[in-house]
Amino acid sequence: MAVNKVEINGVVKLDLTQDTVTAAKLAHGETAHDARGELITGTMTAPQLQIAVTTSAGATVTATKGSKTVSGTADASGNCTLTVDETGTWMLTVSTDKYTVTADVTVGTNTLELYPGPACDPVFANNDWATIVAACQTKTVPASWKVGDSKVMAVLGAGDIQVDIIGKNHDDYADGSGKAPLTLQFHKCIDYGKMNSSSENSMGWKNCTMRTTTMANALKWIPADLRSSVRAVKKKTASKGNSSTAAVTTTSDKMFLLSEVEVLNTTSQSVSGEGTQYEYYKTVANQKKVSYSSTSTANWWLRSPRKTDATSFLILYFNGTKGSASDSYSNNSNWTAPAFCF
């Protein structure tokens, strides 16, 4: 026989190597026997043809090819696998209660990521904030939205302030649902305050006044119709100051300050492990900030406690050509430029 043994992925499904009948006779219906005249039998389990999709949890996933249709629902992790009965290209439709997206998929290819979302303008600033929020929360942010793009937001008490994209897929959502598509930050400093009521840093970022009170109330700066859309992300910071070996703790923050390494990619005065540098701050000129009420260069708080004393947190100081980390007593007042994610 020309073909008398079938293997799939290294597993023998049919073996007729002892067959004495010719291929031509088999084609005319003759039964295969071995040299002893015993009937040769084989079994063959056809492999399942599947289309695997990662999408929004609860989305309806439908594959269509001609008159054939197969549907399923994405589980809580956003996974859906459809079993189809034919190879080739199928049209995939994924729908939520608000959005629908379609794509062609070939059976047997890798898992397809397909998220229904709003119709976005490729220019970030041309979209309204509701569309930006929806794109983030459906994970359909266009590739054309780049780090460094900005859009104006009406900030309570500070007027119209530019908001910058400082990172894409940088921060982890606190609920474990993956990466926040965008991390945003006010371009100008919008508030002036203390890290703590006393000049100490033993409480670290987790328990300082800036986090527990100022940042906890900072959603007031966001327009009222967007506040509920701000999502908590995980931030890592030294548990205390005055120690180069302080444990790094993880907090869940909706509004947060950046660490030394997230801005400067250094740990000159902070412990390692407080995140990684945002793409935006790889451009040195972006490290300079002014306040909403002035054109003068502002010193702005970082959330990193200083590792070499028990009294200070770090500030970002811009010396005219580049930024550097400096120290400031915890009960000193400096400017803040909070960041957040939708």
Feature annotation, model-predicted:
Residues 117-342:
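Collagenous Gly-X-Y triple-helix signature in extracellular proteins
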Residues 29-32, 53, 78, 94, ...:
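Extracellular/surface recognition and adhesion modules
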Residues 65-84:
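Short, acidic Ser/Thr/Gly-rich low-complexity loop/linker segments typical of extracellular
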Residues 59-63:
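Hydrophobic beta-strand segments
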Residues 86-98:
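A short, solvent-exposed beta-strand micro-motif common in secreted/extracellular proteins
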Residues 49-57:
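A short, amphipathic beta-strand motif
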Residues 1-48, 99:
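Beta-rich interaction/scaffold domains
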Residues 95-118, 256:
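Structured interaction patches on ligand/partner-binding surfaces of diverse proteins
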